[in-house]
Amino acid sequence: MVALRLPRGLWTAALTVMLVVLGAPVAEGRDSPQDFVVQFKGECYFYNGTQRVWSVDRYIYNQEEFLRFDSDMGEYRAVTPLGRPDADYLNGQKEALEQKRAELDTVCKHNYQIEEGTTLQRRVQPTVTISPSKAEALNHHNLLVCAVTDFYPSQVKVQWFRNGQEETAGVVSTPLIRNGDWTYQVLVMLEMNLQRGDVYTCRVEHSSLQSPILVEWRAQSESAQSKMLSGVGGFVLGLIFLGLGLFIRHRSQKGLVR
Protein backbone atom coordinates (compact mmCIF):
# COMPACT_ATOMS: atom_id res chain seq x y z
CA MET A 1 0.00 0.00 0.00
CA VAL A 2 1.20 3.50 -0.84
CA ALA A 3 -0.16 6.59 0.92
CA LEU A 4 0.31 10.10 -0.39
CA ARG A 5 -0.79 13.25 1.39
CA LEU A 6 -1.81 15.64 -1.32
CA PRO A 7 -2.93 19.10 -0.16
CA ARG A 8 -4.90 19.71 -3.35
CA GLY A 9 -8.57 19.49 -4.12
CA LEU A 10 -11.76 21.27 -3.29
CA TRP A 11 -10.30 24.19 -1.35
CA THR A 12 -13.58 26.09 -1.58
CA ALA A 13 -15.24 23.45 0.58
CA ALA A 14 -12.30 23.46 2.99
CA LEU A 15 -12.44 27.24 3.31
CA THR A 16 -16.20 27.13 3.87
CA VAL A 17 -15.76 24.59 6.66
CA MET A 18 -13.04 26.70 8.28
CA LEU A 19 -15.22 29.81 8.26
CA VAL A 20 -18.14 27.91 9.77
CA VAL A 21 -15.91 26.42 12.46
CA LEU A 22 -14.40 29.75 13.45
CA GLY A 23 -17.88 31.11 14.02
CA ALA A 24 -19.24 28.01 15.76
CA PRO A 25 -18.25 28.80 19.39
CA VAL A 26 -19.92 32.22 19.23
CA ALA A 27 -23.07 30.81 17.62
CA GLU A 28 -23.35 28.22 20.36
CA GLY A 29 -22.96 30.83 23.08
CA ARG A 30 -19.48 29.72 24.13
CA ASP A 31 -16.41 31.90 24.53
CA SER A 32 -13.96 31.79 21.64
CA PRO A 33 -10.56 30.33 22.54
CA GLN A 34 -7.61 32.71 22.48
CA ASP A 35 -5.65 30.43 20.14
CA PHE A 36 -7.02 28.08 17.51
CA VAL A 37 -5.67 25.95 14.67
CA VAL A 38 -7.73 24.70 11.73
CA GLN A 39 -6.18 22.01 9.53
CA PHE A 40 -7.14 20.28 6.31
CA LYS A 41 -5.46 17.00 5.31
CA GLY A 42 -6.05 15.30 1.97
CA GLU A 43 -4.81 11.69 1.84
CA CYS A 44 -4.74 9.22 -1.08
CA TYR A 45 -4.15 5.49 -0.52
CA PHE A 46 -3.11 3.11 -3.30
CA TYR A 47 -3.15 -0.70 -3.39
CA ASN A 48 -1.30 -2.47 -6.24
CA GLY A 49 -0.69 0.74 -8.13
CA THR A 50 -4.00 2.34 -9.04
CA GLN A 51 -5.93 -0.94 -8.99
CA ARG A 52 -7.56 0.11 -5.71
CA VAL A 53 -7.62 3.79 -4.74
CA TRP A 54 -9.13 5.28 -1.61
CA SER A 55 -9.09 8.91 -0.47
CA VAL A 56 -9.87 10.61 2.84
CA ASP A 57 -10.17 14.33 3.57
CA ARG A 58 -9.85 15.26 7.23
CA TYR A 59 -10.90 18.57 8.79
CA ILE A 60 -9.29 19.26 12.17
CA TYR A 61 -9.94 21.98 14.73
CA ASN A 62 -7.48 22.39 17.63
CA GLN A 63 -5.99 18.93 17.02
CA GLU A 64 -9.40 17.21 16.98
CA GLU A 65 -10.88 15.83 13.75
CA PHE A 66 -14.49 16.96 13.46
CA LEU A 67 -15.38 16.28 9.81
CA ARG A 68 -14.34 13.70 7.22
CA PHE A 69 -14.96 12.93 3.56
CA ASP A 70 -14.38 9.25 2.74
CA SER A 71 -14.40 8.33 -0.96
CA ASP A 72 -15.86 4.90 -0.14
CA MET A 73 -18.83 6.61 1.54
CA GLY A 74 -19.12 9.33 -1.12
CA GLU A 75 -20.28 11.98 1.34
CA TYR A 76 -19.20 14.10 4.30
CA ARG A 77 -19.54 12.53 7.75
CA ALA A 78 -19.41 14.34 11.11
CA VAL A 79 -16.77 12.89 13.45
CA THR A 80 -17.86 15.09 16.40
CA PRO A 81 -21.01 17.18 17.00
CA LEU A 82 -19.04 20.23 15.83
CA GLY A 83 -18.99 18.77 12.31
CA ARG A 84 -22.72 18.09 11.91
CA PRO A 85 -23.69 21.52 10.50
CA ASP A 86 -20.80 21.37 8.03
CA ALA A 87 -21.67 17.83 6.89
CA ASP A 88 -25.32 18.78 6.33
CA TYR A 89 -24.37 21.91 4.39
CA LEU A 90 -21.69 20.33 2.18
CA ASN A 91 -23.75 17.23 1.39
CA GLY A 92 -26.49 19.59 0.19
CA GLN A 93 -24.19 21.17 -2.41
CA LYS A 94 -24.79 18.57 -5.13
CA GLU A 95 -22.47 20.02 -7.77
CA ALA A 96 -19.61 20.49 -5.31
CA LEU A 97 -20.23 17.00 -3.90
CA GLU A 98 -19.93 15.43 -7.36
CA GLN A 99 -16.69 17.36 -7.90
CA LYS A 100 -15.36 16.05 -4.59
CA ARG A 101 -16.21 12.46 -5.58
CA ALA A 102 -14.42 12.95 -8.91
CA GLU A 103 -11.20 13.92 -7.10
CA LEU A 104 -10.41 10.21 -6.81
CA ASP A 105 -9.49 10.46 -10.51
CA THR A 106 -8.66 14.15 -10.95
CA VAL A 107 -6.42 14.39 -7.87
CA CYS A 108 -5.36 10.97 -6.53
CA LYS A 109 -4.80 9.03 -9.75
CA HIS A 110 -3.50 12.14 -11.51
CA ASN A 111 -0.85 12.76 -8.85
CA TYR A 112 0.05 9.07 -8.73
CA GLN A 113 1.10 9.27 -12.38
CA ILE A 114 3.22 12.35 -11.60
CA GLU A 115 4.94 10.80 -8.57
CA GLU A 116 5.34 7.29 -10.00
CA GLY A 117 8.55 8.03 -11.89
CA THR A 118 10.23 9.80 -8.96
CA THR A 119 9.02 9.19 -5.42
CA LEU A 120 7.28 5.83 -5.90
CA GLN A 121 10.11 4.24 -7.89
CA ARG A 122 12.96 5.72 -5.84
CA ARG A 123 15.36 3.06 -4.55
CA VAL A 124 18.46 3.44 -2.34
CA GLN A 125 20.53 0.36 -1.46
CA PRO A 126 21.28 -0.28 2.24
CA THR A 127 24.71 -0.43 3.84
CA VAL A 128 25.14 -3.43 6.17
CA THR A 129 27.74 -3.82 8.94
CA ILE A 130 28.15 -6.21 11.89
CA SER A 131 29.81 -5.42 15.20
CA PRO A 132 29.79 -6.96 18.71
CA SER A 133 28.44 -4.81 21.51
CA LYS A 134 31.48 -5.58 23.68
CA ALA A 135 34.94 -7.17 23.42
CA GLU A 136 34.91 -10.80 22.30
CA ALA A 137 35.24 -13.49 24.98
CA LEU A 138 34.71 -17.18 24.25
CA ASN A 139 31.94 -18.98 26.17
CA HIS A 140 30.47 -15.66 27.28
CA HIS A 141 27.21 -13.99 26.29
CA ASN A 142 27.51 -11.19 23.80
CA LEU A 143 25.34 -9.16 21.49
CA LEU A 144 25.95 -8.91 17.76
CA VAL A 145 24.54 -5.81 16.10
CA CYS A 146 23.60 -5.81 12.42
CA ALA A 147 23.30 -2.17 11.35
CA VAL A 148 21.26 -1.67 8.17
CA THR A 149 21.51 1.98 7.18
CA ASP A 150 20.66 4.53 4.48
CA PHE A 151 18.01 2.61 2.52
CA TYR A 152 14.75 3.54 0.78
CA PRO A 153 11.89 2.61 0.73
CA SER A 154 11.34 1.59 4.33
CA GLN A 155 10.33 -2.06 3.83
CA VAL A 156 13.29 -4.31 4.68
CA LYS A 157 13.81 -7.89 5.88
CA VAL A 158 16.74 -8.73 8.16
CA GLN A 159 17.65 -12.27 9.28
CA TRP A 160 20.39 -13.75 11.46
CA PHE A 161 22.13 -17.08 10.71
CA ARG A 162 24.60 -19.09 12.80
CA ASN A 163 26.69 -21.57 10.83
CA GLY A 164 24.07 -21.53 8.07
CA GLN A 165 21.06 -22.06 10.35
CA GLU A 166 18.59 -19.23 10.91
CA GLU A 167 18.46 -17.82 14.44
CA THR A 168 15.08 -16.60 15.69
CA ALA A 169 15.49 -16.78 19.47
CA GLY A 170 17.31 -13.85 21.02
CA VAL A 171 16.73 -11.55 18.03
CA VAL A 172 15.68 -7.99 18.90
CA SER A 173 15.11 -5.11 16.49
CA THR A 174 14.87 -1.37 17.00
CA PRO A 175 11.93 0.49 15.47
CA LEU A 176 12.51 1.85 11.98
CA ILE A 177 14.51 5.08 12.27
CA ARG A 178 14.01 7.99 9.84
CA ASN A 179 17.22 9.75 8.90
CA GLY A 180 15.40 12.86 7.70
CA ASP A 181 16.80 12.65 4.15
CA TRP A 182 14.33 10.12 2.68
CA THR A 183 16.39 7.19 3.98
CA TYR A 184 15.96 4.85 6.93
CA GLN A 185 18.01 2.69 9.26
CA VAL A 186 17.38 -0.19 11.63
CA LEU A 187 19.49 -2.18 14.11
CA VAL A 188 18.81 -5.91 14.47
CA MET A 189 20.60 -7.52 17.42
CA LEU A 190 21.33 -11.18 18.18
CA GLU A 191 22.08 -12.42 21.68
CA MET A 192 24.50 -15.35 21.50
CA ASN A 193 27.05 -17.39 23.45
CA LEU A 194 30.33 -16.99 21.59
CA GLN A 195 31.94 -20.28 20.56
CA ARG A 196 35.22 -20.79 18.72
CA GLY A 197 34.75 -21.22 14.97
CA ASP A 198 31.18 -19.91 14.85
CA VAL A 199 30.22 -17.96 11.75
CA TYR A 200 27.34 -15.48 12.02
CA THR A 201 25.64 -14.03 8.96
CA CYS A 202 23.30 -11.06 8.66
CA ARG A 203 21.05 -11.41 5.61
CA VAL A 204 19.23 -8.33 4.26
CA GLU A 205 16.51 -8.28 1.60
CA HIS A 206 15.38 -4.98 0.08
CA SER A 207 13.57 -3.90 -3.08
CA SER A 208 16.66 -1.96 -4.25
CA LEU A 209 18.73 -5.18 -4.38
CA GLN A 210 18.80 -7.79 -7.14
CA SER A 211 19.94 -10.34 -4.56
CA PRO A 212 20.16 -10.25 -0.73
CA ILE A 213 23.20 -8.77 1.02
CA LEU A 214 25.10 -11.32 3.15
CA VAL A 215 27.62 -10.05 5.71
CA GLU A 216 29.62 -12.55 7.80
CA TRP A 217 31.21 -12.22 11.22
CA ARG A 218 33.57 -14.88 12.61
CA ALA A 219 34.37 -15.48 16.24
CA GLN A 220 38.10 -15.26 16.94
CA SER A 221 39.82 -17.58 19.38
CA GLU A 222 41.63 -16.10 22.36
CA SER A 223 44.99 -17.15 20.88
CA ALA A 224 44.12 -15.44 17.61
CA GLN A 225 43.18 -12.30 19.47
CA SER A 226 46.46 -12.45 21.42
CA LYS A 227 48.44 -12.88 18.20
CA MET A 228 46.61 -9.97 16.62
CA LEU A 229 47.24 -7.74 19.64
CA SER A 230 50.91 -8.81 19.70
CA GLY A 231 51.23 -7.99 16.02
CA VAL A 232 49.64 -4.57 16.50
CA GLY A 233 51.86 -3.91 19.52
CA GLY A 234 54.99 -4.93 17.61
CA PHE A 235 54.03 -2.71 14.69
CA VAL A 236 53.52 0.30 16.96
CA LEU A 237 56.81 -0.39 18.77
CA GLY A 238 58.61 -0.61 15.41
CA LEU A 239 57.20 2.77 14.40
CA ILE A 240 58.46 4.28 17.66
CA PHE A 241 62.02 2.96 17.13
CA LEU A 242 61.96 4.05 13.47
CA GLY A 243 60.94 7.56 14.48
CA LEU A 244 63.62 7.65 17.18
CA GLY A 245 66.30 6.50 14.71
CA LEU A 246 65.31 9.13 12.16
CA PHE A 247 65.42 11.80 14.86
CA ILE A 248 68.93 10.79 16.02
CA ARG A 249 70.18 10.68 12.42
CA HIS A 250 68.74 14.12 11.74
CA ARG A 251 70.47 15.55 14.84
CA SER A 252 73.78 13.95 13.84
CA GLN A 253 73.63 15.43 10.34
CA LYS A 254 72.96 18.89 11.78
CA GLY A 255 76.01 18.51 14.04
CA LEU A 256 78.26 17.61 11.08
CA VAL A 257 77.09 20.62 9.10
CA ARG A 258 78.09 22.94 11.93
Swiss-Prot record:
InterPro entries: Ig-like_dom, Ig-like_dom_sf, Ig-like_fold, Ig/MHC_CS, Ig_C1-set, MHC/Immunoglobulin, MHC_I/II-like_Ag-recog, MHC_II_a/b_N
Annotated signal sequence range: 1-31
GO biological process: adaptive immune response; antigen processing and presentation of exogenous peptide antigen via MHC class II; peptide antigen assembly with MHC class II protein complex; positive regulation of immune response; positive regulation of T cell activation
Record key words, sorted: Adaptive immunity, Disulfide bond, Glycoprotein, Immunity, Membrane, MHC II, Signal, Transmembrane, Transmembrane helix
Annotated ranges, domain Ig-like C1-type: 126-230
One annotated GO molecular function: MHC class II protein complex binding
Gene3D superfamilies in alphabetical order: Class II Histocompatibility Antigen, M Beta Chain, Chain B, domain 1, Immunoglobulins
Glycosylation sites recorded in the entry for this protein: 48
Span list, region Connecting peptide: 218-227
Beta-2 as annotated region, ranges: 124-217
Membrane spanning residue stretches: 228-248
Cytoplasmic topological intervals: 249-258
GO cellular component: late endosome membrane; lysosomal membrane; MHC class II protein complex
Lineage: superkingdom: Eukaryota
Cellular compartments annotated: Membrane
Region (Beta-1) location: 32-123
Membrane topology: Single-pass type I membrane protein
Extracellular side: 32-227
Disulfide links within the chain: 44-108, 146-202
Family of the protein in this entry: Belongs to the MHC class II family.
UniProt name for this protein: SLA class II histocompatibility antigen, DQ haplotype D beta chain
Organism: Sus scrofa (Pig)
